[in-house]
Amino acid sequence: MLELARQLHQDAAEKGDSSFFALRPSLGIDFICWDAEDCGTPSFDAHGENHESTWCLGSQYWSGKHHVDGYTARYGINLDMVGNANSIFFRETISMLYAPSVVDKVWAAAHRIGYGKFFSYEDGGAVTDDHVQVNRSGIPCIDVIATDTNSGGFPATWHTMNDNMKYISKETLKAVGQTMLEVMWTEQ
């Protein structure tokens, strides 16, 4: 997110303008860092049910109380675990239910600029993630999330001591970042 914001600012500065919004006054971009996404009751908890209300606390709060009265957004793109080497992003099920046109827009952008190997048109599974809360607030939102092609779950290093910078791929981050910039610059 920081690099995307830097790129937007740099592009505006190169054009002699200090504000991205002056270049594209109809387009506002919110960068949001969610918190407490993974704090939920595990599905294997023997002491009770898997309470959905215990997950994605940051996006629950934001979705229930927008930062500005009358806030609206055309759509959202939630980026989660988008830096692993050899990542492939499938069309996540909840994204396809609530925001198929946004999925199509992002995947088409990736393929148009040469990053199709990262964005598969195959359908993936459903993931309880921050985009669920945003969709429930009435804003179509998708989840770009890496899943392991062998297991159908998350990468093997997820939530382990090996979940560290060693496994972050510059190539994958570039593919996702360039795709997001393409989506932003071509938005009407």
What are these regions (language model features)?
Residues 2-98:
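Acidic/histidine-rich catalytic neighborhood of metal-dependent amide-processing enzymes
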Residues 75, 82-188:
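Active-site-adjacent substrate-binding region
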